[in-house]
């Protein structure tokens, strides 16, 4: 603990009675007081001059011009803060749009609900950029040659890379925080962008937390947001099933998510260490106890972002696991979840540990409150088959006679004539919906993703019946889930997987 430079003044103690002062005593006392004041004044001036010349070190995490995106180089705040922030917030007219990727050759039923295509949404979001684009991403692989594949389905990713280069050519700042080491060892995307002026930082999460940076979100101009399951990978646009959300014209939420981006950014400098306590400027004012309240297309809405792991949650930030459990705990009617992986264990520790936190929450909701639980899990050629006993165990709790309803299905994307594309053709979504709230995240459901891996979540609640022109966000997400649940690509655990598109064969 730092000691103060000087002690607080203490009132002098005087005797209860004193002899009367003589006139010359008063004069002498006055001269002494004046002399003391003069000495103090001269000393203060000397001290101020001395301190003025001493450079003061920045606080931990303070932004320095050489370390920040170009849009920050004239101060320690993003380009849109603080001069324009208040004015922009007054002009906020928040809008949330669900976005998704449907793999090629995976037709949905005619007239079924759908979200905006992800590739289209990303390109439109970049078209709105005027000052800066900040991207947090697990890895980058936007071109076919990145993985040695020549396939027309990579064209959308290549168009996205070209769009980003065009933004840099228009002097729009691009800052990227990505995980190190990376899965995309042969990708040149970030080198290409850096050569055009992009600022790239690799965050050594393995050294810092023994995890990875698994987040996937954008902050554009401190005003618009994308977040969801999709990586910066061309396969996420055409070969993998994804779901996310774009939020437009919502600077309060965008600048809150920007604080999470900044936690990654400051950890991307050489020899960075995790702080014991994050500085106040990283703190969030929005969380599950005090969410953002605003109008989304005129509809009263509450929303907040969560984050993981706990070490990357400054004061006020709700932990991602806590957000998931809170949404589950508030459900009274149903919990529908779509995730790529479901393990009530660790996935990347040896030996693995049992971790039934989410599993217990689903069981408690179904058994204790009669909540209808549906879990839709992805399966592809790279799926770990040891997941399926856990899924069967969860479904075994179901007992309609006792009003306990737990159903599990496996979503299988047919490989078809796309076998030349590795690590694709899978449901990669990570979302949950209840009658009260929508949760969209970036994490698979196992312990490591919440204890050591960097991820984010978005929790949104809209008032039923407050939107005469359309459904609430949670209703829209429920419709998308039920579309997938009732499709021919969703197979019950008591069924049989068609073809050779999944490691599990029923």
Curated annotation (Swiss-Prot):
The keyword Ion transport does not apply. Pfam families: PLDc_3. It catalyses: Exonucleolytic cleavage in the 5'- to 3'-direction to yield nucleoside 3'-phosphates; a 5'-end 5'-dephospho-ribonucleotidyl-ribonucleotide-RNA + H2O = a ribonucleoside 3'-phosphate + a 5'-end dephospho-ribonucleoside-RNA + H(+); a ribonucleoside 3'-phosphate-2'-3'-cyclophospho-GMP + H2O = a ribonucleoside 3'-phosphate + 2',3'-cyclophospho-GMP + H(+); a 5'-end 5'-dephospho-2'-deoxyribonucleotidyl-2'-deoxyribonucleotide in single-stranded DNA + H2O = a 5'-end dephospho-2'-deoxyribonucleoside in single-stranded DNA + a 2'-deoxyribonucleoside 3'-phosphate + H(+). Keywords: Cytoplasmic vesicle, Disulfide bond, Endoplasmic reticulum, Endosome, Exonuclease, Glycoprotein, Golgi apparatus, Hydrolase, Immunity, Inflammatory response, Innate immunity, Lipid metabolism, Lysosome, Membrane, Nuclease, Nucleus, Phospholipid metabolism, Repeat, Signal-anchor, Transmembrane, Transmembrane helix. One of its GO terms (molecular function) is single-stranded DNA 5'-3' DNA exonuclease activity. Glycans are attached at residues 150, 171, 249, 281, 403, 417, 427, 444. Expressed in plasmacytoid dendritic cells and monocytes (at protein level). The exonuclease activity toward ssDNA substrate is Ca(2+) and Mg(2+)-independent, but it is inhibited by Fe(2+), Cu(2+) and to a lesser extent Zn(2+) ions. Residues 209-236, 423-449 form the PLD phosphodiesterase domain. Changing residue 212 to A: Loss of exonuclease activity toward ssDNA substrate. Changing residue 435 to A: Loss of (S,S)-BMP synthase activity. No effect on protein expression or localization to lysosomes. Loss of protein stability. Its EC number is 3.1.16.1, 3.1.4.-. Highly N-glycosylated. Changing residue 255 to L: No effect on exonuclease activity toward ssDNA substrate. The keyword Hydrolase applies. GO terms for cellular component: early endosome; endoplasmic reticulum; endoplasmic reticulum membrane; lysosome; nucleus; phagocytic vesicle; trans-Golgi network membrane. Changing residue 368 to S: Increases exonuclease activity toward ssDNA substrate. The active site is at residues 214, 216, 221, 428. Optimally active at acidic pHs. Belongs to the phospholipase D family. Homodimer. The catalytic domain contains two conserved PLD phosphodiesterase HxK(x4)D(E) motifs that accomodate the phosphate group of the nucleic acid substrates, with one nucleophile histidine residue forming a phosphohistidine intermediate and the other histidine protonating the leaving 5'-OH ssDNA/RNA fragment, resulting in the cleavage of the phosphodiester bond. The homodimer has two independent catalytic domains arranged at the dimer interface. 5'->3' exonuclease that hydrolyzes the phosphodiester bond of single-stranded DNA (ssDNA) and RNA molecules to form nucleoside 3'-monophosphates and 5'-end 5'-hydroxy deoxyribonucleotide/ribonucleotide fragments. Partially redundant with PLD3, can cleave all four nucleotides displaying higher efficiency for ssDNA and RNA fragments initiated with uridine and guanosine residues and lower efficiency for cytidine-initiated substrates. This is 5'-3' exonuclease PLD4.
